């Protein structure tokens, strides 16, 4: 799939994910300049810090992503006398509480992360007391098919969590990489079970999004 194509109904490609994550972050960290102009959003998407991977998007790419997301009810354009500005609608579209919105934003921007990483990286965005609070909110997201739990593999000390709204091919690539990482320690049947469980969560997500769009 090309970067310029939509990831399918209810799914977002890598550019759309970066756009949503950047809007969520800037709403919390730069409220004085939010909603964002297109130029400010491009700069936010291409930041060298707090982004994994670092991207180099053009105004055309970001503008196209915004139009696709607007059609899905995820962003909204605010017309202004000086400049048009964009805001996200993720919390309203997906019915998220503030804590869940922050976690989704972090996972949009940096992919799979541990509970401790999410706690550290959320300190400017939301006041979580500890990793237990984060895990509770993640479990609620997982139950709705919006996030995935990735059990730790060989050489890793902690489990990781990521959002489940990306391109299915990208999710499958993550799963395949983790299967290879864990191949030396766990048998193929365990990896297959994990993949089947994650595929079930993806199916649940598709059903949930179909409900929202209906």
UniProtKB/Swiss-Prot annotation:
Record Gene3D superfamilies: Winged helix-like DNA-binding domain superfamily/Winged helix DNA-binding domain
InterPro entries assigned to the protein according to its UniProt record, in alphabetical order: DUF480 (IPR007432), WH-like_DNA-bd_sf (IPR036388), WH_DNA-bd_sf (IPR036390)
Pfam families: DUF480 (PF04337)
Similarity remark: Belongs to the UPF0502 family.
Protein name, per record: UPF0502 protein Pput_3252
Source species taxonomy: Bacteria, Pseudomonadati, Pseudomonadota, Gammaproteobacteria, Pseudomonadales
């Amino acid at each position: 799939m090309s970067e310029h194509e939509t990831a399918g109904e209810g799914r977002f490609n890598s550019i759309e994910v970066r756009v949503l994550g950047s809007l969520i972050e800037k709403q919390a960290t730069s409220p004085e300049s939010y909603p964002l102009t297109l130029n400010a959003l491009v700069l936010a998407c291409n930041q060298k810090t707090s982004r994994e991977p670092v991207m180099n998007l053009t105004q055309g790419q970001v503008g196209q992503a915004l139009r696709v997301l607007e059609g899905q009810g995820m962003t909204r354009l605010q017309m202004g006398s000086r400049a048009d500005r964009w805001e996200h609608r993720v919390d309203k579209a997906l019915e998220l509480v503030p804590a869940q919105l922050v976690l989704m934003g972090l996972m949009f921007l940096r992919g799979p992360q541990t509970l401790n990483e999410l706690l550290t990286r959320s300190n400017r965005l939301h006041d979580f007391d500890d990793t237990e609070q984060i895990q509770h909110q993640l479990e609620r997201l997982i139950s709705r098919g919006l996030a995935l739990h990735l059990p730790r593999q060989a050489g890793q000390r902690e489990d990781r969590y990521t959002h489940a709204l990306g391109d299915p091919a990208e999710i499958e690539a993550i799963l395949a990489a983790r299967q290879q990482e864990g191949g030396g320690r766990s048998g193929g049947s365990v990896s297959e079970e994990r993949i089947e469980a994650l595929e079930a969560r993806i199916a649940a997500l598709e059903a949930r999004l179909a409900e929202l769009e209906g």
